[in-house]
């Protein structure tokens, strides 16, 4: 049993906890503690009721020191609530924590991870790309087999790298990629404003519900971290759109082979049924973004939108639930880290 603590109980932290139960991994993962500065009643309420993902299928209750996840047989899981703002104060040793899922979005370098380990955790997994000094960055399904026992402090990448990197790998393995560009069409996030208000990024001073808003992205750097051979070969831009969840990615790549649309799509289908089963999915149904809400895959390719120009310029539309898919990959990576120890 992997004993897990969640540091940061925001969008990803709460989705990770739900995913432990909804993905059927509760028999392998036990969440023993959550560290969050918010009040226990708000933590429990937002775990039970979620605007994007609906009501949690488990009954949730709480007191000032615990969240309780109730099972139908009358038993319940008790999760310790902590409200500590500094990592060295966290009682991971006393709680017997094996692995910390750091979902704060604040911490992400080797020193931060080492503080978790010094506090008693054995392993640390960050929920964002993190610094280059981490032991490894894992995009599950692509490079998780590179994990070793020496990799104690790891990043799970970002939701967008988890979406696009598996597709890049499939295309490169099959056809060879020369270069590419990506446009991320991302749902609004909590670093945006409800109405116009001050922000360091002037575009993010504007109301999230009223505009399509360009934002900076380092997605191309995330691709290079996983595939060093693509250094300076990919560029990316990102826009935020007035939806609360689900992201679309417009991928264009130049390839070394001459292909047709069916060649590209069939390659994705094959991967989704074999090497990337559960990670990549494929559809030709006439779906829209809401239809991918709460989808656990990292990437879903809409085959009806695949285009090929002059045999070697390939354009694809790839969907992901940027919260739920990523939360499920956090758990997959956590178990993969445990398996190396």
Curated annotation (Swiss-Prot):
Q: Which Pfam families match?
A: Gp_dh_C, Gp_dh_N
The enzyme's E.C. designation: 1.2.1.72
Task: Please give the SUPFAM superfamilies that the UniProt record associates with this protein.
Answer: Glyceraldehyde-3-phosphate dehydrogenase-like, C-terminal domain (SSF55347), NAD(P)-binding Rossmann-fold domains (SSF51735)
- Extract the Gene3D superfamilies matched here: Dihydrodipicolinate Reductase, domain 2, NAD(P)-binding Rossmann-like Domain
Q: Where is the protein situated, by its record's location annotation?
A: Cytoplasm
Q: Which residues bind substrate?
A: 158-160, 204, 217-218, 240
Q: Where is the active site?
A: 159 (nucleophile)
Q: Name one GO molecular function term.
A: erythrose-4-phosphate dehydrogenase activity
Q: Name one GO cellular component term.
A: cytosol
Enzyme class (EC, first level): oxidoreductase
Q: Name one GO biological process term.
A: pyridoxine biosynthetic process
For binding NAD(+), which residues are annotated in this chain's numbering?
A: 11-12, 322
Keywords noted in UniProt: Cytoplasm, NAD, Oxidoreductase, Pyridoxine biosynthesis
Q: Where is this site: Activates thiol group during catalysis?
A: 186
In which pathway is this protein known to take part?
Cofactor biosynthesis; pyridoxine 5'-phosphate biosynthesis; pyridoxine 5'-phosphate from D-erythrose 4-phosphate: step 1/5
Q: Which reaction does it catalyse?
A: D-erythrose 4-phosphate + NAD(+) + H2O = 4-phospho-D-erythronate + NADH + 2 H(+)
Subunit info here reads: Homotetramer.
UniProt function note: Catalyzes the NAD-dependent conversion of D-erythrose 4-phosphate to 4-phosphoerythronate.
Q: Which family does it belong to?
A: Belongs to the glyceraldehyde-3-phosphate dehydrogenase family. Epd subfamily.
Instruction: List the protein's name.
Output: D-erythrose-4-phosphate dehydrogenase
The organism is Vibrio cholerae serotype O1 (strain ATCC 39315 / El Tor Inaba N16961)
């Amino acid at each position: 049993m992997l004993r897990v603590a969640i540091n940061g109980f925001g969008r990803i932290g709460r989705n990770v906890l739900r995913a432990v139960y909804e993905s059927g991994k509760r028999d392998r993962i036990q969440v023993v503690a959550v560290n969050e500065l918010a009040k226990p009643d708000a933590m429990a309420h937002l775990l039970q009721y979620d605007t994007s993902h609906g009501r949690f299928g488990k009954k949730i209750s709480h007191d000032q020191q615990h969240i309780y996840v109730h099972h139908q047989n009358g038993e319940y899981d008790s999760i310790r609530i902590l409200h500590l703002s500094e990592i060295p104060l966290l009682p991971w040793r006393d709680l017997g924590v094996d692995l910390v899922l750091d979902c704060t979005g604040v911490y992400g370098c080797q020193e931060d991870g080492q503080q978790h380990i010094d506090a008693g955790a054995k392993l640390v997994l960050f929920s964002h790309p993190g610094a280059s000094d981490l032991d490894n960055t894992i995009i599950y399904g692509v490079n998780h087999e590179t994990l070793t026992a020496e990799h104690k402090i790891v990043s799970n990448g970002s939701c967008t790298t988890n979406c696009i990197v598996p597709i890049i790998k499939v295309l490169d393995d099959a056809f060879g990629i020369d270069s590419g560009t990506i446009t991320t069409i991302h749902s609004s996030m909590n670093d945006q404003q409800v109405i116009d208000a001050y922000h360091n990024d002037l575009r993010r001073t504007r109301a999230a519900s009223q505009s399509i808003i360009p934002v900076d992205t380092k997605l191309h750097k995330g691709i290079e971290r996983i595939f060093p051979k693509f250094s300076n070969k990919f560029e990316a831009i990102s826009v935020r759109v007035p939806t609360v969840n689900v992201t679309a990615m417009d991928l264009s790549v130049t390839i070394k082979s001459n292909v047709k649309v069916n060649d590209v799509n069939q390659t994705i289908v094959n991967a989704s049924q074999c090497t990337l089963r559960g990670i990549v999915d494929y559809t030709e149904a006439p779906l829209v973004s809401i239809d991918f809400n709460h989808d656990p895959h990292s990437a879903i390719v809409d085959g009806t939108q695949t285009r090929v120009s002059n045999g070697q310029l390939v354009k694809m539309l790839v969907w992901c639930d940027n919260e739920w898919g990523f939360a499920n990959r956090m758990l997959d990576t956590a178990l993969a880290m445990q398996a190396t120890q």
